[in-house]
Amino acid sequence: MAQDVLTDLNKVRNIGIMAHIDAGKTTTTERILYYTGVNYKIGETHDGASTTDWMEQEQERGITITSAAVTCFWNGNQINIIDTPGHVDFTVEVERSLRVLDGAVAVFDGKEGVEPQSEQVWRQADKYDVPRICFVNKMDKLGADFYFTVQTIKDRLGAKPLVIQLPIGAENDFEGIIDLVEMNAKVWRGETKLGESYETVEIPADLADKAAEYRNELLETVAESDEALLEKYLGGEELSIDEIKAGIRKLTVASELYPVLCGSAFKNKGVQPMLDAVIDYLPSPLDVESVKGHVPGHEDQEIERKPSTDEPFSALAFKIAVHPFFGKLTYVRVYSGKIESGAQVVNATKGKKERLGKLFQMHANKENPVETAAAGHIYAVIGLKDTTTGDTLCDPNSQIVLESMTFPDPVIEVAIEPKTKTDQEKLGTAIQKLAEEDPTFKVKLDQETGQTVIGGMGELHLDILVDRMRREFKVEANVGKPQVAYRETIRKKVENVEFTHKKQTGGSGQFAKVIVTVEPLVDAEDGATYEFENKVTGGRVPREYIPSVDAGAQDAMQYGILAGYPLVNIKVTLLDGAYHDVDSSEMAFKIAGSQALKKAAQAAQPVILEPLMAVEVITPEDYMGDVIGDLNSRRGQIQAMEERSGARVVKAQVPLSEMFGYVGDLRSKTQGRANYSMVFDSYAEVPANVSKEIIAKATGE
């Protein structure tokens, strides 16, 4: 089975499968692996035995958390699939896998259409400009409606779908698809052995008109993409299948439209045509623009690397997983050049040398060792010590840093403490390993209580991390109540705040004087929450002490001024100062910088910010009033109401602090008939009465 890596990159596809929870993403991946001959037994998510869900908890919860990269072959082409999680708490995983993909298959639930989470993942894919094809899954489900789903792609995603298949029958009678490119029907008769064989037949008479109508739309769209085709089409000539496919491919690769296919992965119908579409329409590594980066240490000097083995080696580490036998596995996407296993490379992001141990192409949880890694492919590497996600590996003689990925700050925190002394040490190791794998998982020591506090993107995110500590690292820990990650900021600009740090106790003293202006930082580039500008002239503060003032200010920001929450969105400008030949030191200026910031911030109308969540509740109409009333009582702001397949959808912005335990309340108010999803939206100022409570609680008054 172990076929070698293909050298012809035209025949390689690096794709992801993205979807809402339960739209059937993992099942779809499983079927792909089955038909491409990698898997000998079809795994069902229902039995908890699917190949890509390889962590215990994923099997238990039936959701995919870590994206395993899987390689398979189809008709002489190689497909590298990265399974992405659809649950919002794992957005960092999704973003990270999108970064290294060339194309994606968006799986939608044929009954629900575009759901909130699929919308979010879609927006993330837009950010990285990933070409996509859409697969409308679960066509065998009660209430499945292909045309409704296509409409939601237009309405909710604002995207342009291009229908290239129509379903034959629906729900229990779903038996196949009409291929609008080849103008024939493919049907899976009866319970054929796992749907491997399908028959190509004529289009059923009752669907002929509909097929003709959609075929015309398809031809018009394709013809408009190319002058030569347009002339041919307007002249009444037939376009050949190859011409149509080339036209669709061109539009898809340019992300101008998204071909839509349909099927039922669970019932094994429509999977092979989807694989054909992946090869026909999604880009190969050669169709994608050259990857851009910069010279290490000089962000303004841009360089690019073409996806060719003749270029110097460069690769991006996009995932780290702990493997039971090999220890740390680093997944990398090679963008240029090639390299042997055992070779030495440089981690340009950190400026450290690394040696590549063994190289593998992964198949979910089985490994296929390879000797060399070449451009355009995805590998797992053993033996990298200092490399974390988002780092660039490259040729020591020709260094490049591929853009780094920026990760969101955690919105929820819990205190965690080991149950016994022996757990104490293990907890440290466990937290460190998990933080390496997941940059949105943050850890800090609470100075006042001495507790370890972990932060993440949501309750589920932290639940799963604590669960992994128990299973993988055998750490028993007590977890406190979730705490909201508040922030502090200032509202007005305060100029020329002066602070002098003086200490004279015999021997050399300490002396530093700084004058700063502190102001709110608005719309910073790349989401930065702090900026430092130096405007000192004439050496009144020596050059070597300026970074110390900056460091001192950043230190003070960690601990806030109102209630001990970190200060954000602040710009500090150092205007002037004074120093003493003997008594000045880096330490003295650090203290001065820190105290000056505190003094300025207190005068700058400080306020507390809280995370607001975008909440979407789907409820039967009878409970609409209760749901809205409840959201209002939680300080929620209702933003929109709409109807979706017979139910009502309420969209609101609600402070995270008011959303704890919402699951239970919503169930009891609606007899379990409503469900909701929430994602972090933004930080906003807290009302005065709430602010008083937070400060009182923090200062213990």
Swiss-Prot record:
Stretches assigned to the tr-type G domain: 10-286
Pfam families: EFG_C, EFG_III, EFG_IV, GTP_EFTU, GTP_EFTU_D2
Keyword Nucleus: no
Protein name per the record: Elongation factor G
A GO-annotated cellular component: cytoplasm
Entry GO MF terms: GTP binding; GTPase activity; translation elongation factor activity
Gene name per UniProt: fusA
GO biological process annotation, one example: ribosome disassembly
Organism of this sequence: Mycobacteroides abscessus (strain ATCC 19977 / DSM 44196 / CCUG 20993 / CIP 104536 / JCM 13569 / NCTC 13031 / TMC 1543 / L948)
Binding locations of GTP: 19-26, 83-87, 137-140
Keywords (A to Z) from UniProt: Cytoplasm, Elongation factor, GTP-binding, Nucleotide-binding, Protein biosynthesis
PANTHER family in alphabetical order: RIBOSOME-RELEASING FACTOR 2, MITOCHONDRIAL, TRANSLATION ELONGATION FACTOR G-RELATED
Major subcellular site: cytoplasm
Record function comment: Catalyzes the GTP-dependent ribosomal translocation step during translation elongation. During this step, the ribosome changes from the pre-translocational (PRE) to the post-translocational (POST) state as the newly formed A-site-bound peptidyl-tRNA and P-site-bound deacylated tRNA move to the P and E sites, respectively. Catalyzes the coordinated movement of the two tRNA molecules, the mRNA and conformational changes in the ribosome.
